[in-house]
Amino acid sequence: MSGRGKGGKGLGKGGAKRHRKVLRDNIQGITKPAIRRLARRGGVKRISGLIYEETRGVLKVFLENVIRDAVTYCEHAKRKTVTAMDVVYALKRQGRTLYGFGG
């Protein structure tokens, strides 16, 4: 690692990529009890059985939008790591200001 500066292998050199697991159905990791707890925190008493899949779908779309914006901020700054501030700015852009994470 002599004299390469920022980025280990040197920017643009490529190199061997790690094997990445194929992502499928990770949205099912948001379990029924987890959705139930969120609803309870929001003051819901009874929950229809159809709510769980609908909630997973809505959450997936919301997270995709926030993550897309956060990654855009990260790429613009020529970084490879998404920071908490990238997420804060992404949420602010969507009109959902979040306090307590810097900035």
Swiss-Prot record:
Gene name as annotated: his-1
Q: Name one GO cellular component term.
A: nucleus
Q: Which residues are modified to N6-acetyllysine?
A: 17
Q: Which organism is it from?
A: Caenorhabditis elegans
GO function terms (MF aspect): DNA binding; protein heterodimerization activity; structural constituent of chromatin
- Assembly and interaction partners: The nucleosome is a histone octamer containing two molecules each of H2A, H2B, H3 and H4 assembled in one H3-H4 heterotetramer and two H2A-H2B heterodimers. The octamer wraps approximately 147 bp of DNA.
Lineage of the organism: Eukaryota, Metazoa, Ecdysozoa, Nematoda, Chromadorea
Composition bias (Gly residues) maps to 1-14
Where is the protein found, in the record's own terms? Nucleus; Chromosome
Q: Which residues carry this modification: N-acetylserine?
A: 2
The family line of this record is: Belongs to the histone H4 family.
Keyword annotations:
Acetylation, Chromosome, DNA-binding, Methylation, Nucleosome core, Nucleus
Q: What is this protein called?
A: Histone H4
Q: Which residues bind DNA?
A: 17-21
Please give the SUPFAM superfamilies that the UniProt record associates with this protein: Histone-fold
* SMART domains according to UniProt: H4
Residues with the modification N6-methyllysine, per the entry, are: 21
* Chain segments carrying region Disordered: 1-20
User: Which residues are recorded as modified (N6-acetyl-N6-methyllysine)?
Assistant: 6, 13
User: Which BP terms does GO give this entry?
Assistant: defense response to Gram-negative bacterium; innate immune response; nucleosome assembly; positive regulation of transcription by RNA polymerase II
Q: What's this protein's function? A: Core component of nucleosome. Nucleosomes wrap and compact DNA into chromatin, limiting DNA accessibility to the cellular machineries which require DNA as a template. Histones thereby play a central role in transcription regulation, DNA repair, DNA replication and chromosomal stability. DNA accessibility is regulated via a complex set of post-translational modifications of histones, also called histone code, and nucleosome remodeling.
Gene3D superfamilies the record matches = Histone, subunit A (1.10.20.10)
